[in-house]
C-alpha cells in the first residue's frame, strides 16, 4: 500500500479524531419467547451472554492490532414488545433489568431493543412495553428504548405520538437524563448500530455485527485544503474522505465478525460528532462557507454533505445500512452548542435540516414546563418529514425541570451539554388529542 496513504490514516486517528464509533452485535431473541416471563428472561440472559461473550475482547484486540480506536461496544436485540407479549405480564420492567444485567456481564456500553413498532397500530405487548418505559429506564443503566410511530407505507399512528409525548414528560419527572436513552422514530431501520435507537429487526440473521463509523474532524480537515474552490470540488473532497473512513469500518467489521463467528451486517455511513473540539458536523458546514451553522444556507450545505458522504461510502463497502447520514445532535456537537447558545440555531431550523440528513431533533433540551402535547407535536412534525420523504426521522427531546431559555444542562461524557432551546408557546393540544392515524402518502403505493 502507498506509504502516503498509510501516514494519512495514522494522522486521521492521531490528530483528527477518527475512530470507529461503535461495533454493535445484533442478537435475535425470537427463540427466547416463553409464556413464563422468568423462563424467558433466563433464556434472554443466557443467549446474550453466550453470543456476545467475546465482543469486547475482540474489539480490543482489533484496536491494538490496527491502531484504530473503537469508541463503543454495543448490543441490539429483537424488540422486546414482540418477545414479552407471550407472557401476559402487566409490565416488562424485568425484561429491561435482564438486558441491563446481560450488558454488564459482557462489558458493553449500551444495549438497545427495549422497543415497540406501532406505526400502524398496537398489539397488547406494545401497550405494555410503552407504559413500562419510564420505570424500565429508571431501574437500568445501559438499556436504550425506541418506539416507531410511523412509516411511509403505513402513515403516522397519532395515538402513539400522543402517548410518547406523555412518556417523555413521565421520564422528565423521574430523571430528565433518561430521555437521552429514548428515541421516537418514523421509518425505523432494523440494522441501526447507533444508540439510543438501535434494535435487531425480525428480518435479520440470528446474530450479526454492524459497524458505525465517525469522522467529522477528518472531513473538516480535508475541506480546509480546498478553501475557495467550487461546490463541485467540495463534494468530491467529501466523497473521497468518506471512502477512506468507510473502508476502515468495513475492514474492522469483517475481521471482527470473522473472529466472533457471526454474520457481517452493515457499515453505517453516519458522520457522528462528539463534544470534543474538532469533531463537529457544524464545523464542517462552517468550513463550507457559513459564518455560523443555523444561518441561511445551512440546509443546502448539509444536503450536499450528506449526499457526498453516501456516495463515497457506498463505493467503499459491500453492505451499507443503518441510518447513514450526518447526525446533528444539539448536545454532542461543539459547533451546534455554540450556535444554539447565540440563538442562531433554533428548533425550527433543526427541523428543516432533518429533511436532508440522517436523523432528526436529537438531544434537544427544552424548558421543563413544555406540555406533553407540544412534545407530541414535535414528534408528529418529524414523523411527517420522514413519512413524506421516505426516510428515517426521529426525536430525542429532553425537557429539563426548573430550567428555561438561557439555562443549560450538563449530560456528561459523550452526551456533552445543551443550552435550553425555546419552543413555541402556542398550543397544539387540540390537534394531538384528535388521535387516529394520518394516512400514508399517495406516493407510498409502489406495488
Swiss-Prot record:
Homodimer. It comes from the Bacteria. The lineage of its organism: Bacteria, Bacillati, Bacillota, Bacilli, Lactobacillales. Belongs to the UPF0210 family. Gene3D superfamilies: 3.20.70.20. This is UPF0210 protein LBUL_0934. InterPro entries: UPF0210. NCBIfam families: PRK05313.1. Coiled coil: none annotated. It comes from Lactobacillus delbrueckii subsp. bulgaricus (strain ATCC BAA-365 / Lb-18).
Amino acid at each position: 500500500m502507498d506509504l502516503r496513504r498509510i501516514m494519512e490514516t495514522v494522522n486521521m486517528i492521531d490528530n483528527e479524531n477518527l475512530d470507529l464509533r461503535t461495533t454493535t452485535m445484533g442478537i435475535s431473541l425470537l427463540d427466547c419467547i416463553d409464556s413464563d416471563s422468568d423462563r424467558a428472561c433466563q433464556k434472554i440472559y443466557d443467549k446474550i451472554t453466550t453470543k456476545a461473550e467475546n465482543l469486547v475482547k475482540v474489539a480490543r484486540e482489533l484496536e491494538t492490532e490496527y491502531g484504530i480506536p473503537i469508541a463503543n461496544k454495543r448490543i441490539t436485540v429483537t424488540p422486546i414488545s414482540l418477545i414479552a407479549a407471550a407472557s401476559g405480564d402487566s409490565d416488562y420492567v424485568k425484561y429491561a433489568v435482564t438486558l441491563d444485567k446481560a450488558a454488564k456481564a459482557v462489558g458493553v456500553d449500551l444495549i438497545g431493543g427495549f422497543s415497540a413498532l406501532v406505526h400502524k397500530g398496537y398489539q397488547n405487548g406494545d401497550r405494555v412495553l410503552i407504559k413500562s418505559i419510564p420505570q424500565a429506564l429508571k431501574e437500568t443503566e445501559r438499556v436504550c428504548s425506541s418506539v416507531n410511530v410511523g412509516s411511509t407505507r403505513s402513515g403516522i399512528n397519532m395515538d402513539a405520538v400522543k402517548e410518547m409525548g406523555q412518556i417523555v414528560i413521565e421520564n422528565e419527572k423521574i430523571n430528565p437524563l433518561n430521555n437521552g436513552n429514548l428515541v421516537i422514530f418514523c421509518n425505523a431501520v432494523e440494522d441501526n448500530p447507533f444508540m439510543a435507537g438501535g434494535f435487531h429487526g425480525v428480518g435479520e440473521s440470528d446474530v450479526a455485527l454492524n459497524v458505525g463509523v465517525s469522522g467529522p474532524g477528518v472531513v473538516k480537515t480535508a475541506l480546509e485544503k480546498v478553501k475557495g474552490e467550487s461546490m463541485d470540488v467540495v463534494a468530491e473532497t467529501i466523497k473521497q474522505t468518506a471512502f477512506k473512513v468507510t473502508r476502515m469500518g468495513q475492514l474492522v467489521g469483517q475481521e471482527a465478525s470473522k473472529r466472533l463467528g457471526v454474520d457481517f451486517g452493515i457499515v453505517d455511513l453516519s458522520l457522528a460528532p462528539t463534544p470534543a473540539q474538532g469533531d463537529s458536523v457544524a464545523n464542517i458546514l462552517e468550513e463550507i462557507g457559513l459564518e455560523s451553522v443555523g444561518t441561511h444556507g445551512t440546509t443546502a450545505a448539509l444536503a450536499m454533505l450528506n449526499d457526498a458522504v453516501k456516495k463515497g461510502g457506498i463505493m467503499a463497502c459491500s453492505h451499507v445500512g443503518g441510518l447513514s447520514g450526518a447526525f446533528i445532535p444539539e448536545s454532542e456537537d461543539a459547533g451546534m452548542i455554540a450556535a444554539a447558545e447565540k440563538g442562531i440555531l433554533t428548533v425550527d431550523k433543526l427541523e428543516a435540516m432533518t429533511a436532508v440528513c440522517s436523523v432528526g431533533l436529537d438531544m434537544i433540551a427544552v424548558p421543563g414546563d413544555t406540555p406533553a402535547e407540544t412534545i407530541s407535536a414535535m414528534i408528529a412534525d418529524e414523523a411527517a418529514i420522514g413519512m413524506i420523504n421516505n426516510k428515517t426521522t426521529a426525536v430525542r427531546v429532553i425537557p429539563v425541570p426548573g430550567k428555561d431559555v438561557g439555562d443549560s444542562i450538563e449530560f456528561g461524557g459523550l452526551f456533552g451539554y445543551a443550552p435550553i432551546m425555546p419552543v413555541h408557546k402556542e398550543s397544539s393540544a387540540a390537534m394531538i388529542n384528535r388521535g387516529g392515524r394520518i394516512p400514508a402518502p399517495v406516493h407510498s403505493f409502489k406495488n
